[in-house]
Amino acid sequence: MGTLTASLVAPSKLNPEKHSSLFVYKTRRKSHKNQSIVPVARLFGPAIFEASKLKVLFLGVDEKKHPGKLPRTYTLTHSDITSKLTLAISQTINNSQLQGWYNRLQRDEVVAEWKKVKGKMSLHVHCHISGGHFMLDLFARLRYYIFCKELPVVLKAFVHGDENLLKNYPELQQALVWVYFHSNIQEFNKVECWGPLKDAASPSSSGVGGGMNTSFTSNSNIKWILPKPCEETCTCCFPPMSVIPWPSTTNVENGTIQQGLQEQQS
């Protein structure tokens, strides 16, 4: 993921190598003395995954196989300095990736966990849209759009980084992807179902997120039910509680889930 807020620095201090992958900057000269910075989101064209820019860390988990009784989570962060992605695969969220004032300011990390609910595996992905400081609130709509646009890249990073696991358990490619958008603004505080992982990780032809194939999006009446674990102790649900410490504040009306951005625009 790239930076989701514009850097407030003078044009002379902008280093092309430190530009976010999601924003480009243009300088517009109004006079010899005054210049303004115009952040232009790179909103057009497909999001592209580059394997050479992904660093994968396995922390306390098996690279190829995964015991059914151990959680498996993904923590993905982006560096504006190196333009590289770091993916930690572990039993819990890798908090060391999220430390520092810069990460707390940008909040462009994506975290996810595998869950088994009533015998079915699904991938639950969390994104922070707004809340915490005014800059995030100011750019909430843009952040939501960019997260949606870039999520196929994020999911592709998960698939590529954990490819040995998916080779050993190919059925995970059919697991549904649930995306939780966390925001203090009701419009963006919601859950979306992005369909099977193999489709959600593929950019749509329009370049917009929600990379579901035609067979998935053709029926606009499809309603997905967010899987809920059994209330009593069982063997068909794991883990019993989410290992991601974000509050469950997303809006779910009547137990149904909104579909991805591509579906909304079709």
Curated annotation (Swiss-Prot):
InterPro entries: Staygreen (IPR024438). Keywords: Chloroplast, Plastid, Transit peptide. Pfam families: Staygreen. GO terms for biological process: chlorophyll catabolic process. Residues 1-50 form a transit peptide. Its main location: plastid. It is found in: Plastid, Chloroplast. Signal peptide: none annotated. It comes from the Eukaryota. GO terms for cellular component: chloroplast. The keyword Protein biosynthesis does not apply. PANTHER family: LP06106P, PROTEIN STAY-GREEN 1, CHLOROPLASTIC-RELATED. Required to trigger chlorophyll degradation during leaf senescence and fruit ripening. Belongs to the staygreen family. This is Protein STAY-GREEN homolog, chloroplastic. It comes from Capsicum annuum (Capsicum pepper). The lineage of its organism: Eukaryota, Viridiplantae, Streptophyta, Embryophyta, Tracheophyta.
